[in-house]
Amino acid sequence: MADFNFGDLKKQYEMFREPKVVVTIDGNDLKDDGGLTVSSVEVEVTGGYEASIATVTLTGCYDKDTRSFDIKKTKQYLYMGSSIIIYLGYGSAVREVFRGFIARVHFMIPNLSDEDVPSIELTCMDVKGLLMANRHSKRLKSQYYSDAVKEVLEANSFIMQKDSKGGNFTELIINNTPDKPQGAPGGGGGGQQKTTDKRVEMVEESDYDFIVKAAKKYNFEFFIVGSNLYFIEAKKNTTPLIELNPMMGLIDLDIGYDMTGLVKSVVVRNIDMEQGKYIGNKLQSKSKISMGNKAKPLVENQSLVYIDPTTDSKEEAGYRAAYLMNSVDYRLGSVTGVFVGMPEIIPGRFVTLKDFGQPLNNDFYITTVRHSMTRLSYSTRFEGVANQIGK
């Protein structure tokens, strides 16, 4: 059963009639007073390794007589580096869709003949934007990669700050990586690690590069949704987020299947130069790639061989092979759907499409979500992928 039911959301959001946005900057709600208005919001949240971005457009802050912006009215909302939280919904019900910091401020005065009005545009990024802006070469205290990821994240003051209610501004949800012994404390906690000289190192890389490297090494995902930062096993939660059919607020839909680049197997290998020993592992695809029998023979003998000099065991080669096989398999199916605005739709989860007909009916893994809101409308656009033909 899916986590959310469209009928329940329709009732909760009062038939999706009156879009509502709440923007909180440094703990203070941006209020529509003195003419200042949030005229539009665009939020793009990604389940990939990229940073998520939000754009907030403010109007009602320009004096036509003096032809200047009333900075006194807006100053408290314009500080770059300020924390920002965006909630979207309808009527009296809203849900958080973005959390990050103000990275850029633009003042825009359009051509006087245009219908557009002068506005201030706030461009915001999630914390990944900060993790990209450094570079280190150092030996960490942690022995295992999940602990090392936690160590790096906890060193970031923006991540570790408290919100206006005294809670954590960012919650770290970190699964243990396979290099950590079973039975060790979860959540990336260091616990009581054995005394050993083995420690994880960062070499000429940013915090972001290091975490992405660790994610690819063990077939993990690294993304942020609202207040939660995830470093977790890829696609482990297969419970659908929501089931959608053509009668559930559909605006636009594009579904496609493409066998280009698919392979039957992935091989990851390396040579231990000291011992002259072969290290490697092989995985085979189990995906159903066609409704007929024409495509399978074309892929059957195709393989991807990847040389990984960092692999020092069959198990590690298997983790990298799983990451590569997962990446290839999920090239098969793609979806771009636009529905009535639903803040519950997030990346990193599966959405089930039903009653569209075969092969459109399928479980798609959401990779990107874009929420678009004006004072009159709210829509949610999502992109997703699938590793098998629709059923």
Range-by-range predicted roles:
Residues 1-13, 219, 240-241, 245-254, ...:
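Compositionally biased, intrinsically disordered low-complexity segments enriched in polar/Pro/Gly
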Residues 99, 146-150, 208-212, 265-266, ...:
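Extracytoplasmic/secreted envelope proteins and their assembly/folding machinery
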Residues 86, 231-232, 268:
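Short hydrophobic/aromatic-rich beta-strand segments that constitute the beta-sheet cores
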Residues 1-134:
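Assembly/oligomerization scaffold segments
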Residues 99-108, 235-238, 364-375:
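Short, compositionally biased
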Residues 49-76, 249-391:
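An acidic/polar, Gly/Ser/Thr-rich interaction patch typically located in mid-to-C-terminal regions
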Residues 116-249:
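Charged- and aromatic-enriched interaction segments used to assemble
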